[in-house]
Amino acid sequence: MRVEETEVFKKYFKNLTDRERAVFEGGITLGALFHQFVGTPVSKYNKESLERAIEEAMKNQPCVYDIKVKIRNVGEKYVSLDGKMLDVDLKIKINKTVAHLKLEYIPEIDYPLMYVKKFEE
């Protein structure tokens, strides 16, 4: 049983709507991903395995329904992963609500932005 399926866990979130809870869990997951993996050595030779490792690690976070990680702008020589390179699509499911969240670099503001794309209910 996953931790989010236990009654003890659920009682701490009774004051939130399913949408609020999905955004909360998604923000924690994207923040954890960013701060855990930025700085990791990456090159074109290990890019795909690092993408899968990040996905599998983040699936351990509560309520993660699906996650896709792409690492952009990687050459032959290794570099340290930074926020400009991350392109992440995350789905968080709370009951019948699915929040679609995104982490991507936005050149116009020179910032790796985390945001909610949409909800399905």
Swiss-Prot record:
Top-rank taxon, per record: Archaea
Gene Ontology biological-process annotations: tetrahydromethanopterin biosynthetic process
Keywords recorded for this protein, A-Z: Lyase
An example molecular function term from Gene Ontology annotations: dihydroneopterin aldolase activity
Annotated substrate binding sites: 25, 114
Family of this protein: Belongs to the archaeal dihydroneopterin aldolase family.
Name of the protein this chain belongs to: Dihydroneopterin aldolase
Lineage: Archaea, Methanobacteriati, Methanobacteriota, Methanomada group, Methanococci
